[in-house]
Structure formats: structure tokens, C-alpha cells
């Protein structure tokens, strides 16, 4: 049986399609910045795709493929029971109670940006796809850390696949981005490489394949890799996927020329610089303890009620105040949620190690700027002929 459908409009819940940015700023100011940052970046990515001349169809297809495949993945994993392990904060524009408008834009960003950036390298198909996965993870990682810290979403408290975390971000989340984006890129690249003109048939085939197969092939990779950590994502599995992907990329790099920028790539270079600078600035300028997230969360109820999935993994069905370990609290509310509540308010917690979190986000930001500027031709004086 499926979990409650993510597209269920849930009239019994106090959600709104539109919320005043001023009202949201009072509760979660950093989230308002993050929401409109991603919407703006996705719009810039579309403008970039549209300005690609004879390569317009290829780039616009990449944009829409990322939007559709990414959103489909999100909906699938919200719908599946005992995979359903994350809940988004209420944004100023909501599509459903669980899906803010900005989330499809997030998928566009961490899938379109690395896909087209790696196209400039002219790598062979498999190394090209795996480098796209690594670059996608680099784009996503600082957002994964900042968003969790400032309660832009909440995680299931006892779900084994997301239990192992680095700076508050599940290792499983990092591995998912690497494998999902790499799979998406491989499928998309193989389809468009066979039809550079990108006919209508190619568009339909590419959209169908990336939407239908990316998540499935990602799950196959994840299932194999996480056996290194006893069946759940962990440090060994993360190191293994990084090493395998990096080795394949290195083997193909010798056959690739230096990245060649295309007209219009300057907008992507500027966008990544703004993005990778904005997230460290959010860490510096805002206090997570002042953030209040009233939204859907893990259902509140009795402690230690077990639920078991088809793989045999167990987790506690409910969140309970007496025994949970998440980066939020109930300190700002007058009373705890009623048993069975799926909509309630949680309060951000102060930094426990601000220097570590800051170093992680700033380091990823600096590395991200360097990698993307290199891939997009921003670190070379002679740009040569336009790339793909």
C-alpha cells in the first residue's frame, strides 16, 4: 500500500498555496532567501538553455528532463511507505502540502548545471556521466547541510538509510545525488548523442527514459553499495562510490580536451558564484535557534512503536519528545503535539559546533566555484572553439 499521496491536497491541514514572504520571513528568514535563490537560478538556467543557438534544443531538453525526472523522483519517494522519510517546510508558494514550488527548481539546479558544465569537457559517455554525478553532489551538498540546520525540512528520526550523517546531512542523501544525477546524465547523453538535432521523437524518448529509469537504476547502485555498511548507507559506501566514480573519470580524462565554453556560459558562471557564496553567508548571518517550522513532519505519537519494511529494516513509526535525536526541539511551543499529529511546529536548535559547520559549507562553496568555473571555461584565457 502506498503512503499518503504527496499530491493529496489534504484539506484538513492548514496549508496555503501562497504565503506572504513577510510572514514567512518572520518565522524562517533564511528559508525565504533559499527559496527564491533556487527559483532565480532555475530561471537563469532556462534563459541560458534558450540562448544556446544551434544547441538550444539539446539544452532546453536537459532543463525539462531535469525538472520532470527530479520531481518524479521526489513524488515517488514521498509516496512509498517506509521510504517516506522527509518533510519540507512550508514555502511562500506551495504546489501541495508537501511540495514547495522551489523543490522542482532545486532539481533543475543540481541536475542541469552539472550536466551542461560537464558537456563542455568532451569526455567519453561513461566518464562524462559519472563526473556529472560528482559535480551534482558538489552542488547539492552545501544546500543539504544548510537546509537541515535551518529546518528547511525535517528528516525521519529513526530511519536507518538516513541515520549516518555528516554535518547533519545523511550520507545516504549524498550517495543518492551522486548515483541519481549520474544515471540521469548517462541516459540523457546516450539519447541526445544519437540525434544531435534532438527531434520530437528524441525529446519524448529522453523524457520517458529519464523519468522512468533514473530512480530505478539509482536504487540498484545504492542497494549494492550500502552492503559495505551492513545494508545502509555509510562511510565505506560513500568512499567506495567516490573512488569508483573518480577512477572512471580519471581514465577518460586523458582522452578529453580542456573544457570549452559556449556563448552564454557566463550566466552560469555568475550563477554558481552567487549560489556557492550565498549558502555560507546564510550560515554567518542567521541563527538557527530563531527559526520556527510549522509544517508536516513525522507523525507524532507513542515512543518505540516499530514498523518494518520489506527488506527487514525497522524504524519507529512515530516521533516522540521523550526520545528523539534531530536538529530541532519543541522549546518554542506551549504544548507538545497531540498523538497522531502530522502537522505541528518545531523549533531550530543553536549551533553545537559552528566552526565545523561553517568550514564545511565554506569549503564546499570554494571548491564548487573552482570546479564549475573550470568546467565552464571561466579559468582559461583562451576559450577555443565553442563546446557542446
Enumerate the language-model features and the residues they cover:
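Aromatic-rich, lipid-facing transmembrane alpha helices and their immediate juxtamembrane interface loops
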Residues: 1-388
Amino acid at each position: 500500500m502506498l503512503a499518503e499521496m504527496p499530491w493529496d491536497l489534504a484539506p484538513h491541514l492548514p496549508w496555503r498555496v501562497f504565503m506572504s514572504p513577510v510572514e514567512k520571513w518572520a518565522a524562517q528568514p533564511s528559508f525565504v532567501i533559499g527559496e527564491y535563490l533556487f527559483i532565480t537560478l532555475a530561471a537563469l538556467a532556462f534563459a541560458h538553455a534558450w540562448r544556446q543557438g544551434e544547441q538550444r534544443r539539446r539544452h532546453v531538453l536537459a532543463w525539462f528532463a531535469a525538472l520532470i525526472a527530479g520531481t518524479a523522483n521526489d513524488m515517488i519517494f514521498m509516496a512509498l511507505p517506509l521510504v517516506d522519510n522527509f518533510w519540507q517546510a512550508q514555502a511562500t508558494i506551495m504546489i501541495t502540502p508537501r511540495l514547495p514550488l522551489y523543490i522542482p527548481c532545486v532539481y533543475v539546479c543540481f541536475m542541469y548545471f552539472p550536466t551542461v558544465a560537464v558537456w563542455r569537457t568532451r569526455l567519453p559517455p561513461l566518464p562524462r556521466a559519472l563526473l556529472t554525478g560528482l559535480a551534482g553532489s558538489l552542488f547539492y551538498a552545501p544546500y543539504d547541510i544548510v537546509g537541515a540546520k535551518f529546518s528547511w525540512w525535517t528528516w525521519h528520526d529513526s530511519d536507518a538509510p538516513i541515520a549516518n550523517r555528516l554535518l547533519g546531512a545523511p550520507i545516504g542523501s549524498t550517495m543518492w545525488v551522486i548515483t541519481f544525477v549520474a544515471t540521469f546524465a548517462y541516459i540523457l547523453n546516450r539519447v541526445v548523442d544519437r540525434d544531435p538535432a534532438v527531434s520530437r521523437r528524441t525529446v519524448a524518448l529522453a523524457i520517458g527514459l529519464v523519468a522512468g529509469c533514473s530512480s530505478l537504476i539509482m536504487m540498484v547502485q545504492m542497494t549494492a553499495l550500502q552492503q559495505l555498511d551492513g545494508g545502509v548507507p555509510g562511510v565505506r559506501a560513500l568512499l567506495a562510490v567516490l573512488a569508483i566514480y573518480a577512477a572512471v573519470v580519471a581514465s577518460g580524462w586523458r582522452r578529453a580536451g580542456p573544457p570549452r565554453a559556449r556563448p552564454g556560459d557566463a550566466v552560469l558562471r555568475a550563477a554558481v558564484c552567487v549560489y556557492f557564496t550565498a549558502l555560507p553567508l546564510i550560515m554567518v548571518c542567521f541563527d538557527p535557534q530563531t527559526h520556527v517550522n510549522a509544517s508536516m513532519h513525522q507523525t507524532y505519537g507513542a515512543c518505540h512503536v516499530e514498523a518494518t519494511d520489506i527488506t527487514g529494516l525497522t524504524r519507529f513509526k512515530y516521533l516522540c519528545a521523550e526520545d528523539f535525536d534531530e536538529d530541532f526541539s519543541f522549546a518554542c511551543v506551549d504544548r507538545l503535539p497531540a498523538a497522531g499529529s502530522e502537522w505541528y511546529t518545531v523549533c531550530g536548535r543553536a549551533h553545537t559546533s559552528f566552526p565545523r559547520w561553517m568550514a564545511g559549507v565554506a569549503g564546499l562553496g570554494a571548491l564548487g566555484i573552482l570546479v564549475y568555473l573550470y568546467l565552464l571555461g571561466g579559468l582559461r584565457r583562451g576559450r577555443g572553439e565553442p563546446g557542446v
